[in-house]
UniProtKB/Swiss-Prot annotation:
Function noted in UniProt: Involved in the biosynthesis of the osmoprotectant glycine betaine. Catalyzes the irreversible oxidation of betaine aldehyde to the corresponding acid.
UniProt-recorded name of the protein: Betaine aldehyde dehydrogenase
Keyword tags: Metal-binding, NAD, NADP, Oxidation, Oxidoreductase, Potassium
InterPro entries registered for this protein in UniProt: Ald_DH/histidinol_DH, Ald_DH_C, Ald_DH_CS_CYS, Ald_DH_CS_GLU, Ald_DH_N, Aldehyde_DH_dom, BADH
Binding site for K(+) 1: 93, 180
Pathway in which this enzyme or protein is active: Amine and polyamine biosynthesis; betaine biosynthesis via choline pathway; betaine from betaine aldehyde: step 1/1
Annotated K(+) 2 binding sites: 246, 457, 460
Alphabetized Pfam families for the sequence: Aldedh
Classification of source organism: Bacteria, Pseudomonadati, Pseudomonadota, Gammaproteobacteria, Enterobacterales
Site feature (Seems to be a necessary countercharge to the potassium cations) residues: 248
E.C. number: 1.2.1.8
Amino acid sequence: MSRYGLQQLYINGAYVDSTGNDTFDAVNPANGDIIACIQSATAADVDRAVSAATAGQKVWAAMTAMERSRILRRAVDILRERNDELALLETHDTGKPLSETRTVDIVTGADVLEYYAGLIPMLEGQQIPLRDTSFVYTRREPLGVVAGIGAWNYPIQIALWKSAPALAAGNAMIFKPSEVTSLTALKLAEIYTEAGLPAGVFNVLTGTGKSVGQALTTHPGIAKVSFTGGIASGKTVMANAAGSTLKDVTMELGGKSPLIIFDDADLDKAADIAMMANFFSSGQVCTNGTRVFVPKALQAQFEEKILACVQRIRAGDPTDESVNFGPLVSFPHRESVLRYIESGKREGARVLVGGEPMTDGDYAQGAYVAPTVFTDCRDDMKIVRKEIFGPVMSILTYQDEDEVIRRANDSEYGLAAGIVTRDLNRAHRVIHQLEAGICWINTWGESPAEMPVGGYKHSGVGRENGVTTLEHYTQIKSIQVELGEFRSVF
């Protein structure tokens, strides 16, 4: 028997068996152990979930704002009480270090839920006077049933980022986690039910994008899809949403983000920022600053500092709390990252450190790749153009500000960007010219609940977090009231 046993679907407030017979395994990427057997949902299960969500949403939306807020706040309390248990499950499922999952994944997800629980009472309409005898008022009403489709890198955090604003606005959600990391989304469903969420308001359907995702994005009973994943899949989701019932969509589709270090920067700080922007979570972060631009005159000095920082990486068993660098999420993904590394070598980039799988001793059974830094990179290289989603930094040199801005923007992506400088005027001047939705000055990576996040260009549509996201889970109804006479032209 695997550690976590058989995992069912979660529909209408309870675990239920799939109507089909297909299952798939959850694998611990640190050692290759099968930790759970997970049932795959079918199109019939999607129908069941939509029916349950439709009924549950009516109950949920009829509650007062304060009633909904209290239930979501209870869920926040339970998440925090169970933080260590959920963090260990996330570590087993994703390979992320326990030092990370205990302090980031559940913590930041709970913060977002608490933020939206507090915003529920502010979902207000407007009153617009027209004349003495007539006025208009507006109502913000929920969309109904919405779907969330998650990525594998931040399973429970993404489930919370998507469900928190949706539920706060009075909607019901059907959530499909990535088939690579499905386990904590199911636990979140349990927690919502324990907190008092009506049956059917949050459902979890496990399975592949081609089956479950396809059925969700084309289902006529779903009003909106929020998706996190790759560009190709995002285009499919958007086409399905438009081709079925003109569903609203929110998408976060990844990036190849630039980090620009200017000649006045504190290079020790710049190196620390570059390390966080490339090797946190073993490089599996959508916003990673993998294109690191350094003035040509500072290249050698910066490389020395990066090499010193790499020595502080502590790879190993992710359940060891002294470890800060774990395996990649899966063995197939490790092979994908290694192919990118080999392409970098073939195209002439110089390996400063790493560039190989980690296969000795304790690493032999896991999906480990050594932290890798390429230098002498060119803009046309595959490792510079494509999202690798692994621990691979590319160092590029530049001569002047105009050049680096142009090259930083020369990408189909536009998710994030950052600069390191002591010059406040330059900081704002450059940031305002960078084509990215999330920008950092002298820092990297923080995405607090209050901050809207999302991309330009092919990196996404819409935003997550912040007040604006809550508004996009509602629709505005306008009502005109006439207190005086009505005169017909007929």
